[in-house]
Design a protein with these regions (language model features):
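FAD-binding subdomain of flavoenzyme oxidoreductases
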Residues: 1-97
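C-terminal substrate-recognition/cap domain of FAD-linked oxidoreductases
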Residues: 61, 67, 72, 80-263
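Long, contiguous binding/interaction regions
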Residues: 270
């Protein structure tokens, strides 16, 4: 999910790890305050400590009710303020993904001048009119524009497919197809890759600006080619977002990796290369 449960770790109840020195089996408990969480350690090790052979995962009921909206913002900084307010509202939308103008254009959902917010709620238990109504009040407070009729259609009946139409549907299709486009693009001389970061809200504006300027400068230095660097915010915590940056440039002789290593990682300007 975009908020609240943003990691698969949140749904893992217990694990069994086979390591060179023996087997680690964690207990099945709904929660524990007895020291560091061993399941987080096991999952976060990503195979460096051993092989996970079993896991208990909390299943989620299939959603019966949905509500969705595609929102346009003329100014990216107002869109960021909006998703911050949503993240801190307690509404916990299941989808709250913000595309900057260039990312929106790459995804085929914008013209490169407006930021796009893909906003959605889902539940297996109850209709979501009240949640969406309050979220759209927040959107309106920050200058967002949306199609009211489309929002109503998304909530009109159980099993509505409105959330897969319009800008939300176009972005979803582009997101799913991107890995299939990336590898053939390399063969055509195009470098395209994405890296994830995390930062607190109070430092986001400067972080966003510095990452775009510094990474673009490093790639231009390595390739002597123009570069496009876009951003999407995919996951939100009350204290900060997880911005993903995508680089697109032409491939030439030279080492982009060495240039990026010389530039350093977002950690150096207060962020992280993982969320």
């Amino acid at each position: 999910y975009a908020t609240q449960y943003t990691h698969i770790d949140d749904f893992v109840e217990a694990t069994r790890l086979v390591a060179p020195s023996g087997v680690v089996q964690t207990r099945r408990l709904p929660g524990s305050g007895a020291g560091p969480a061993p399941d987080r350690l096991v999952i976060g090790s990503e195979g460096t400590l051993g092989v996970i052979t079993e896991a208990w995962v909390r299943l989620q009921a299939t959603p019966r009710f949905r509500a969705s909206a595609s929102v346009k913002f003329g100014e990216f900084h107002r869109a960021v303020a909006c998703v911050r307010a949503l993240a801190q509202s307690g509404l916990n939308p299941s989808n709250c993904r913000l595309l900057d103008p260039l990312e929106a254009a790459f995804s085929g959902v914008g013209d490169g001048r407006s930021a796009i917010l893909v906003l959605a709620f889902e539940s297996s238990d109850h209709p979501l009119h009240a949640w969406m109504a309050r979220a759209l009040e927040i959107v309106g407070d920050h200058g967002g524009q949306y199609d009211r009729d489309a929002v109503e259609r998304s909530m009109s009946a159980e099993g509505s497919s409105e959330h897969r139409s319009g800008a939300a549907g176009a972005w979803r299709e582009a997101f799913l197809r991107m890995p299939y486009w990336r590898d053939p693009a390399v063969g055509l001389g195009v470098i395209m890759d994405t890296f994830e970061t995390a930062i607190t809200w109070d430092r986001f504006d400067e972080f966003y600006r510095n990452v775009k300027e510094d990474v673009a400068s490093a790639v231009r230095k390595a390739t002597a080619q123009d570069v496009r660097l876009s951003c999407r915010i995919t996951h939100l915590s009350p204290d900060g977002p997880a911005p993903y940056f995508t680089i697109v440039t032409r491939a030439v002789d030279g080492s982009v990796a060495s240039a990026l290593a010389a530039w350093g990682v977002p950690y150096l300007i207060g962020g992280s290369l993982a969320r």
